[in-house]
Amino acid sequence: MATKFPKFSQALASDPTTRRIWYGIATAHDFESHDGMTEENLYQKIFASHFGHLAIIFLWTSGNLFHVAWQGNFEQWVANPLKTKPLAHAIWDPHFGQAALKAFTRGDTVANISYSGVYHWWYTIGIRNNVELYTGALGLLVLSAVFLLAGWLHIQPKFKPSLSWFKNNESRLNHHLAGLFGVSSLAWTGHLVHVAIPASRGQHVGWDNFIMTPPHPAGLQPFFTGNWSVYAQSPDSMQHVFGTSQGAGTAILTFLGGFHPQTQSLWLTDMAHHHLAIAVIFIVAGHMYRTNFGIGHNLKTILEAHRPPSGRLGKGHIGIYQTLTNSLHFQLGLALASLSVVTSLVAQHMYAMPPYAYMAFDYVTQSALYTHHQYIAGLLIVGAFAHGAIFFIRDYDPEQNQDNVLARMLAHKEAVISHLSWVSLFLGFHTLGLYVHNDVVVAFGNPEKQILIEPIFAQWIQATSGKMLYGFQVLLSSSTSNASVAAQQLWLPGWLEAVNNESNSLFLTIGPGDFLVHHAIALGLHTTTLILVKGALDARGSKLMPDKKDFGYSFPCDGPGRGGTCDISAWDAFYLAMFWMLNTIGWVTFYWHWKHLSLWQGNVAQFNESSTYLMGWLRDYLWLNSSPLINGYNPYGMNSLAVWSWMFLFAHLVWATGFMFLISWRGYWQELIETLAWAHERTPLANLIRWKDKPVALSIVQARLVGLVHFTVGYILTYAAFVIASTAGKFS
C-alpha cells in the first residue's frame, strides 16, 4: 500500500480528516518535528537543501539572461540606453489583437518591459551583446546543475558532514569571511578592472583576449614595487563619454567621489577600489579565528571576556557560546535580522547612489527596486523575531544561561516592553495630533494655521555631510573645517557636487512634510518592534500564562480557565506584527515615491505643501496618481496602462479575500463545509467524485495564515501595480 502524505509524520498520515493535508504542508519544513529526526540528520538535511536553493537561484538568473538574449532588445538598448525601453521577454497570448499591440508596446510585438534594472547592470559590468548573455545563461545553467549534484552528494552516507563539522564555529567563520566575502569581492574587483572598466572606455575584453589585455598601461610593476598610487593617476575626465575612449583615462582604482556626469552612476573605478578594500579586510578577517594551528582568536574566550567589571551585566556572555552553537533558530534569527538591514540599505543606496549606468534616468525601475527591497527587508525582519521566539520556546536552557545577558534580558522584559509601548504611544498621539490639526485647519480654509516644524537636527546632519542649502557651515559644508581641508584633494569635490546637485536623489532637501512623515514611520517601526519584541520575550511565559513554552509556538487559545489566553502565543505576535510591518512599509514607500515624483516632475512644491495634512496625502498622492490607473481601460478603448489597471483591480480582490478568513470563525466554515459535502454527495455526476478524508474547517491559526497571506500578497501587488503604472504613465 502506498504511504500517505506526509511521510515524515506517522500520526498525521493516519489522520482521517483533511487536517492531514493542511498540517502536512504546514510542518513540511519543520524538520525538528519529523519522525525519527536526529540532531545530526537535521543539520545534514538543511545543509543539502542550501545547495538546492542555490541551484534554483542560478536557474532563475540563467532564465533572465536567456529570455532577454532571445526575446529582449539588449543590443538596441545598448546603442541608445536613454531612449529605448528594455524588454524582459515576449508574451504569447491570443487575446492580444492589433489594438492591444499598439496600446502596450507601440511596436509590432507584445512584450514585457523590464523594470528590474538588469539591463543597466549588464551594461555597466561590460556586457554588450546577446552572445555574451547566452554565454552567461549557459554558464549559470551548468553551475545550477553542479549545485544540484552537490546537494545530492551531501545526503549520500559517504559524503554527509558530521555534527562536529557543522558546529566548528571558528572554521566556518574563517571560510565564510575569507572565502564567501573576501575572495568573491576580490573576484568582482578583478571583473570590474579587467572587463567592466575597459568596456566603459570602449575597449572590448572577452574570453578571447582577456589574458593578453593588461587593464593598466603600467601592468603589475607598480603593484610589486609598492607604487600603488600609479593606479589612481589619470582617471576618466568629467567629459568622458561612457562606453567610448572619448575623455577616458587609465586609472583603475580611484577615490573620486560623486557621480559620472553622463551616466549619473558611481564611478566604476571608485567601485573597483571599494570592492578591493572589502576583499582585503575580509580576507584578513578570515584568518583571525583559531582552528588547527593553535593561533588566533577563540570565540568562546572572546565572548566570555565580555563581562563589565561594574557587574551590571551579571555573568555577561558566559553560556552564550554554547547556546548559539546549539540553536539553529538563534543563528537563523541573527542571519535574517542582518540580511534585513542589508536589504533595506540596498533599497536606500540603489537610488541615492546608483551604481549602474543610466539607471538614475529610469524612474520606474528606481521606484520598483526601492519598493521591492523595502518589502523584502520587512518580511525578513519579522522572520528574524519569529525565529527568536521559537529559540526561546525550543532551544533556550535556563540552567546554561543563569544570570547572563540573555537571562537578564528576560528578567527585565517588562521594562523593555513598557518603554517601547510608551514611545509608540507618544509618537502615535503626537504625530496623528499634528496631522489631524493641520487637516482640520486646511479643511476650514486656514492653511496658515498649520503647525509646521522644520527638521533642523536632520538638516544639520545633512549639512555635516556637505549640503550647503541650509547655511549651517559645519564640517563638510564649511570649506575651512578640518574635515573639508583633509579630503579636498581626494573625494570631496565630486561628493560636494553630487550632494548639492538638486537633480539627483542624494540628500534630498527636507522640510515640515518630511518631519511629519518621518515620525509617522517612526511610529510604525516602534509599534512593529514592540509587538515582535513582546512576542519573543513573552514566548516562554508571562504573568497570565507562566507555562506558555509547554504549548509550543503557535497555540490558538488555552480556554477561559486562566482568564482567556487567546491571541498571546508567539505566533499571534508574528501575525499582528505582519500587519504593522506592511502598514509601515506602505508609509515608507508612499513617502519615497511621492517625494520623488514631485522631484522628477520639477514640482517639489506639491509634496512640500500637500504632505503636511492627511487629505493632501489622500488627494494629491493616492487619488491623483491612481486615476490614470483606473482609466487604463474604459469604454473608449485601452492604453498602455491597461494591464496594470487589471492587476490593480485583481490585487485588490486578493487583498479583500483575506478578510473572509480573518473575520470569521471555525464554526461557520465547518457548517458550510458539511452542507456543501451533503449537497455534493446527493448531486448526480458530481457524486461520482469521492474523497477519503473527512472535510474539516481550517484551524484558527491556519485560517489566520491563509487570511494573512491573501492580505499580504494583495497589499503588495496592489501597490506594485500602482507604483509602476503611475510612474510609467508620467515618464514613458
UniProtKB/Swiss-Prot annotation:
Q: How does it sit in the membrane?
A: Multi-pass membrane protein
What biological process terms from GO does the record include?
Answer: photosynthesis
One GO location term (cellular component): chloroplast thylakoid membrane
| Residues that bind chlorophyll a B1 | 652
EC number(s) from the headed UniProt entry:
1.97.1.12
HAMAP family, sorted: PSI_PsaB
Please describe what this protein does: PsaA and PsaB bind P700, the primary electron donor of photosystem I (PSI), as well as the electron acceptors A0, A1 and FX. PSI is a plastocyanin/cytochrome c6-ferredoxin oxidoreductase, converting photonic excitation into a charge separation, which transfers an electron from the donor P700 chlorophyll pair to the spectroscopically characterized acceptors A0, A1, FX, FA and FB in turn. Oxidized P700 is reduced on the lumenal side of the thylakoid membrane by plastocyanin or cytochrome c6.
Q: What is this protein called?
A: Photosystem I P700 chlorophyll a apoprotein A2
Taxonomic source organism: Cyanidioschyzon merolae (strain NIES-3377 / 10D)
